[in-house]
Amino acid sequence: MEQTLMDKLTILADSAKYDVACTSSGASRTARPGTVGSCYAPGCCHAFTADGRCVSLLKVLMTNCCSFDCGYCVNRRSNDIPRATFAPRELAELTMEFYRRNYIEGLFLSSAVLGTPDYTTERMLAVLRLLRGEYRFGGYIHAKAIPGTSPELLQQLGYLADRLSVNVELPSERSLNLLAPDKGRHSIFRPMKQIAVSGAASREELTLYRHAPKFAPAGQSTQMIVGASPETDYHILKLTEGMYQKYGLKRVFYSAYIPVAEDTRLPALDTKPPLLREHRLYQADWLLRFYQFEADEILDKDNPNFNPYLDPKCNWAVQHYGLFPVDVNRAPFEMLLRVPGIGPKSARRIWRARKQAALGLDELKRMGVVLKRAQYFIICRGFSGAHPGRGTAGRERITRALIDPNVFSGSCEQLSLFSPPAVDNLIGQGVPPWAAVRMVREEAVQCLAKAL
């Protein structure tokens, strides 16, 4: 039975949902006379996935027919699923029809490997040439570079797309060889390096010739799957740091592994996606990019995984409590960034405002400081800090306060997730009341963490 355009869109939009490496454009190219659409820095809007969610882009695959057999991928060769393939003109016309109806502002185009990487890339290039040339589409385009694509085709792709991305997928060569034998480390990092070098050359050329063609002006990104292989959070974070430094990536995305098929090399089908771990990786990634942290400060070989109860910044502050409290009216900018509850914007506001007058809690609150966390790590005008003491006991108390502020302040009652007899039973066994409450609340936190 011949597939309709809607059949193809339904299949290929659904097949693209596991690819998370797309966000707002990050480019500021304005419309030119005679073109359709524009690309604004705040990002794209009004795109719809197959299940009706509103997202930034039309996110779709060119095809889900794949010659690779990657164990973690729903589109792998051995998986029995409905298959579909867009013709280049079909997808170009579909994109323009969606754009004219104001459904989308851009296109996120990826693909399974149809035949060979070069053949697949040539089909993707055909779509982009139609959009940029025949239809004069000036909107945002994010294209996925297929691992193993020739440098010549990758170069052409970069001049037509606003952003390129090559997915690392798995954080070690060993896991890549085990789960994706058709891919190799070289086939992933070679195009990543080419994109970085070509992008730098393009930016340099633009300083000499203002109308020079732009190569991937919004940069490049990548994606890693979390939980499909045994690597630690420290290993993943070190790889992330290396890619930011070496290839100048704009973003690294993390995707909690969702079991899609029975495979002895992978977690069981009833395994829940490690969403809390994914969340912690994004928080640590933020520290690398905006807070001047290094991976070795956040985690190390002795503590290779994230604390499930505290975010990475709070965990670092508790472990280095000897550096606190800091005086917000005197501390260097770099130290302000390391205070829980103070972000880059509020740190800059503090830096500017304290030149005029000494700052107190009221001023800090107006500047966006989250005092619920910051109060344990700062002193300021009229406030000597809410410090729970030094040593192991002090760190334990502040940890519990950061998990649940009511535990430390005692200002109000926190309703328990469990029945009161649970506390009474522990007290009856000789456990001190404060310890009984702590044990029950720890059980509650663990239960919530597992649910995540």
Where are these regions (language model features)?
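Long C-terminal interaction/binding lobes of large macromolecular proteins
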Residues: 1, 214-216, 234-245, 275-277, ...
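Flexible, acidic/Gly-rich N-terminal and inter-domain linker regions that tether
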Residues: 1-65, 370, 378, 386, ...
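Conserved Radical SAM active-site core
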Residues: 1-68, 72-222, 226-230, 243, ...
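A structural motif corresponding to the C-terminal lobe/cap of the Radical SAM core domain
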Residues: 177, 189-196, 227-235, 241, ...
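Long, highly charged, low-complexity intrinsically disordered interaction regions
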Residues: 265-337, 373-422, 451
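Residue-level signature of tetratricopeptide-repeat
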Residues: 353-354
